[in-house]
């Protein structure tokens, strides 16, 4: 998708690194269905394309087909920043002839994707933007860290995010992306299921503290150090009841894995799904 838009991308496999060059030249404002249909995250090009090019045509996203998952909160935030938007034939048409301008935006409900799209758009907008009722997932915080490395002035205040529009982007910057906490949680639950001693390195245990607390209540044993988590064989898995919630609550993306572990427990365990309606 990024290559189609016009970015020059090199994948340095030996360094596990992606290098992006010439990000301001020959940028397309179209993100077609054939690319965006495969992944929900494709809609995240809408905010920055609109902010930089003053227009964008983005296919409605596909992929990750859980729940109805509308993009109404994404569009709600962009309209507050000054965009004119219409949806036709499966595409989002967005325009801001005079550019995006900072605004005060309160999300009706918490959304990771909408928070990220608003962040990316506000980063390029003129003036200050205040986002309220934001998602504060580690991935959102990592995006903010990256944007600040690029030259942004973004602060997190609880569930509020204050963004000062960036006039000049720094070049030749480096950023190390945060580890995938859902992958980590999946492997930890797998370790608990098979009853093997497994050690996970180069991670931040604080990021998945809630998940570890839940698993400890179920009888899973851990040894936790600054950047490692060690899972030990558990003699008995205990029943538990919990609800999925936005971060820092238990993530919906781990409830299916946890359900498998629950089959090992004595008694009846329960999960209430609060993020997706189906």
Predicted regions located by residue number:
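Short, structured segments at the rim of ligand-binding sites
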Residues: 1-278
């Amino acid at each position: 998708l990024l290559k189609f838009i016009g970015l020059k991308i090199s994948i340095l496999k030996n360094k596990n690194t992606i290098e992006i060059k010439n990000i301001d030249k020959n940028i397309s404002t179209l993100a077609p269905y054939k690319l965006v249909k495969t992944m929900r995250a494709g809609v995240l090009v809408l905010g920055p394309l609109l902010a930089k090019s003053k227009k964008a045509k983005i296919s409605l996203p596909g992929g990750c087909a859980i729940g109805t998952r509308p993009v109404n909160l994404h569009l709600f935030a962009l309209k507050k920043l000054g965009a004119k938007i219409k949806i036709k034939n499966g595409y989002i048409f967005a325009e801001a002839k005079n550019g995006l301008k900072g605004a005060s935006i309160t999300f009706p409900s918490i959304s990771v994707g909408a928070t990220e799209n608003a962040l990316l758009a506000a980063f390029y907008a003129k003036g200050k933007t205040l986002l309220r009722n934001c998602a504060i997932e580690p991935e959102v915080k990592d995006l903010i860290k990256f944007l600040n490395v690029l030259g942004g002035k973004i602060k997190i205040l609880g569930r509020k995010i204050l963004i000062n529009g960036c006039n000049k982007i720094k070049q030749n910057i480096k950023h190390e992306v945060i580890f995938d906490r859902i992958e980590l949680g999946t492997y930890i639950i797998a370790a608990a299921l098979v009853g093997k001693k497994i050690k996970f390195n180069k991670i931040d245990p604080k990021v998945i503290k809630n998940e570890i607390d839940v698993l400890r209540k179920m009888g899973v044993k851990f040894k936790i150090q600054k950047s490692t988590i060690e899972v030990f064989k558990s003699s008995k898995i205990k029943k538990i009841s919990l609800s999925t919630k936005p971060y820092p609550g238990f993530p919906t993306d781990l409830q299916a894995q946890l359900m498998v572990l629950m089959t090992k427990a004595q008694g009846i365990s329960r999960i209430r799904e609060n993020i997706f309606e189906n």
